[in-house]
Amino acid sequence: MELPEYEVYAIKYGDRVGTRGQIFMHGDPHDAPLAMDYFVWVVRNAERTVVVDVGYGQAEGERRGRSFLRCPSEGLALLDIDAATIEDVVITHMHYDHAGNLELFPAARFHIQDDELSFVTGRAMTYKALRHSFVLDDVLDMVRLVYGD
């Protein structure tokens, strides 16, 4: 059996410079600067295009002090992909920088692990340190997209 071949593209839409103490829980606040880039991914072949993660929006990026180089849908357009026509989107996890532009994909079926949705709608979100990386509206939108009619 021959498996289909796919092309994989990383589309950078933002970046930041911080320290480990700012980026990771329990990081050393005395660390040197640490650069971090933000990407959405495209996996495609002649029959199918899948987007992996959808990035954050400009307003959320500004609220968190992140750069916003381009809207992820503009990055997709550079590959002649219309976000509005994508049928499958995989969300690896619900952090704001992975699940913030769900509305850009009105035709998509969203794929996310049950355990991730259980986590972001469970008791762990009562702890500020754990919920810091999530946006409540993104979580609510994902619940509607996955479980709604």
Residue ranges: model-predicted function:
Residues 1-2, 39-45, 100-103:
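Short amphipathic alpha-helices and their capping/turn segments at secondary-structure boundaries
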Residues 2, 70, 75-81, 85, ...:
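Metallo-beta-lactamase
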Residues 4-7:
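Extreme N-terminal starter segment of soluble prokaryotic enzymes
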Residues 10-12, 112:
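Structural signal for conserved beta-strand scaffold positions within catalytic alpha/beta enzyme cores
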Residues 66-112:
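Active-site metal-binding motif and surrounding structural segment of the metallo-beta-lactamase
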